[in-house]
């Protein structure tokens, strides 16, 4: 057993320090990369790898978040693309706001490098071109992440690296274990079954009692304050204000 383990570790070390032979293009914005090549690499991977979506995300990102992108080339042809994020924050984001430790956490800065997205679930970090075997690309993914991290040292050290979210049954990504990555279990995606609700009371009736009581208490407090809850019919007139409130919630998360 010890000999088998040592052989495995030696092989993994050799893999980590051996270039893949693929070529790379890196950028701080998706618009800086070759548009045609990005579209070829991301075709079939869904709209969240689309340039229009990513450009919109860049324009309206949280203040502490920055983006990195990479195209992987093999023999001059694009075979994969990567979407990466860098979060510069402090340790208070991992604590409840009313925690006595939150203030101390603000004094400790942290940098998290993510291949994927903190703003949604699923694999939003790696798209492999159709017709390319994914298992041949993951070593290049690890090399691309390493290169971007090395260049990012000019603005600070990275404390943690995430590649998210990959299902446990994803065999190809297991190759990343040879590059010192390990698996971390995360919570399952939330699935909300929409019921045949016709009114707000129908919605409240479907909640657990403690949540239903909390919602009713909020309505009672609004009524006591002399306020009136009305249906928003003219949505377009309040569209900007609603978006500002949404942004406020998003900024508080980070």
PLM features: residue spans?
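N-acyltransferase acceptor-side catalytic subdomain
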Residues: 1-254
